[in-house]
């Protein structure tokens, strides 16, 4: 903000990048912005980062809130190893801006790309991935936050099998009192295949079990190589769930606040649950036992994150002393702000305060407006492959070091995913 920026053309858009960074590759683009990979050319090791440009921040209030939510939560969760780390924030012209730049940890791919590669994953991989997701969720939930959009595409993975949760734009608070959850159902566009049945059926309350259901869907996808509930639409999605889990009992149905939804479920033929052994005959029985607990239809009977971490399937990784909780509850009070100018001020303050924190120096009193320079064209993502290794002398000895690798030797070749970090 207080120095001249380099200008690059990324996905046909101009990106203004801090002068000590060189953009090296386009990574992904989506409805909310674009992402590129860059290197810190001023440092000895030339560390790599992902730079996300969130666009059209003030075109709609829902996008403004989403951007602010993402920034605040990334900062709040910055200290956990299984949540993507934010390094820096930037706004080019603080007096008139519609974009925010986020400098983040660069990860090689996401879990969606790994699964889609079609190459074999081992049970040891499944254990490690699910354990890391649950560790991240424990930290998130302890701050009274529900992620609400857990899916393989929002789980970033490095070559050493280190996994990190990203994309908090849809997150909300998890108070049992609906009045304390501003906008809980607003913008609920989480991917249908990982959406909990209580969301689809309008249960009378929502809580952390929403994320637990998504973890179950992810485990099933790891076991089978394809989504378990691949619904084409709302009704098809619900029917797939009921076909697998069976007809819910009357006590569960009583929690559905929508009378029409209750009537629909009751109108269907009674179905018995299909054992997960039928879907995954070669799977570890302990994995299937955990899966059944993660995918309990009734959220009140669904396993909690803490209990899931203690499940025998994850025993090789579980260490209560190494599974921290967040030291403070996240403040969602900004969700009540409706004035666009006030939201703009809050975003600017958030960026300035974080920049001050990471630089350990005062705010620039008069931040200068960027002077545009000729844009440099950036190479597009070439979909180059890389390996996720799982060779190690001991799982258990490496657990404390968070070196997520394995005794057996296996390499996962997969294509880079264009939408990672986006």
From Swiss-Prot:
It holds the Pfam family Pkinase. This is Mitogen-activated protein kinase spm1. Residues 359-422 are annotated as: Disordered. SMART domains: S_TKc (SM00220). It comes from Schizosaccharomyces pombe (strain 972 / ATCC 24843) (Fission yeast). GO terms for molecular function: ATP binding; MAP kinase activity; protein serine kinase activity. PROSITE patterns: MAPK, PROTEIN_KINASE_ATP, PROTEIN_KINASE_DOM, PROTEIN_KINASE_ST. A motif (TXY) lies at residues 186-188. Its EC number is 2.7.11.24. Residues 411-422 have a biased composition (Basic and acidic residues). Residues 364-379 have a biased composition (Polar residues).
């Amino acid at each position: 903000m207080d120095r001249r920026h380099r200008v690059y053309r990324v996905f046909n858009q101009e990106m203004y990048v801090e002068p000590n960074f060189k953009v090296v590759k386009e990574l992904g683009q989506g409805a909310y912005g674009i992402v590129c990979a860059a290197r810190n050319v001023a440092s000895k090791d030339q560390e790599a980062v992902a730079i996300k440009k969130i666009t059209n921040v003030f075109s709609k209030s829902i996008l403004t809130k989403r951007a602010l939510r993402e920034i605040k939560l990334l900062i709040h969760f910055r200290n956990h190893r299984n949540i993507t780390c934010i390094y820096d924030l930037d706004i080019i012209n603080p007096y008139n801006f519609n974009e925010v730049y986020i400098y983040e940890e660069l990860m090689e791919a996401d879990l969606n790309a790994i699964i889609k590669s079609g190459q074999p994953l081992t049970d040891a991989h499944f254990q490690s991935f699910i354990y890391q997701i649950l560790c991240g969720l424990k930290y998130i939930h302890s701050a009274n936050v529900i992620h609400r959009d857990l899916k393989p595409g929002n789980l970033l993975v490095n070559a050493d099998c280190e996994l990190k949760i990203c994309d908090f734009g849809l997150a909300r608070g998890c108070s049992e009192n609906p009045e304390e959850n501003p906008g809980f159902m607003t913008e609920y566009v989480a991917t249908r295949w990982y959406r909990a049945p209580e969301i689809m059926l309008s249960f009378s309350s929502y809580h952390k079990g929403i994320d637990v259901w998504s973890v179950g869907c992810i485990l099933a996808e790891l076991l089978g190589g394809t989504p378990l509930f691949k619904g084409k639409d709302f009704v098809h999605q619900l029917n797939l769930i009921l076909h697998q889990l069976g007809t819910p009992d009357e006590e569960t149905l009583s929690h559905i606040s929508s009378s029409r939804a209750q009537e629909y479920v009751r109108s269907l033929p009674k179905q018995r649950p299909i054992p997960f052994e039928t879907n995954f005959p070669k799977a570890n029985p302990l994995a299937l036992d955990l899966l059944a607990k993660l995918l309990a239809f009734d959220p009140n009977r669904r396993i909690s994150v803490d209990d899931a971490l203690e499940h025998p399937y994850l025993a090789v990784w579980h260490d209560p002393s190494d599974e921290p909780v967040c030291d403070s509850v996240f403040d969602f009070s900004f969700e009540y702000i409706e004035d666009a100018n006030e939201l703009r001020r809050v975003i600017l303050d958030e960026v300035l305060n974080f920049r001050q924190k990471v630089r350990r120096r005062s705010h620039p009193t008069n931040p200068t407006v960027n002077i545009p320079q000729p844009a440099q064209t950036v190479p597009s993502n070439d979909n180059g492959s890389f390996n996720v290794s799982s060779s190690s002398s001991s799982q258990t000895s490496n657990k404390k070091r968070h070196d997520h690798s394995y005794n057996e030797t296996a390499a996962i070749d997969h294509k880079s995913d264009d939408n990672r970090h986006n």
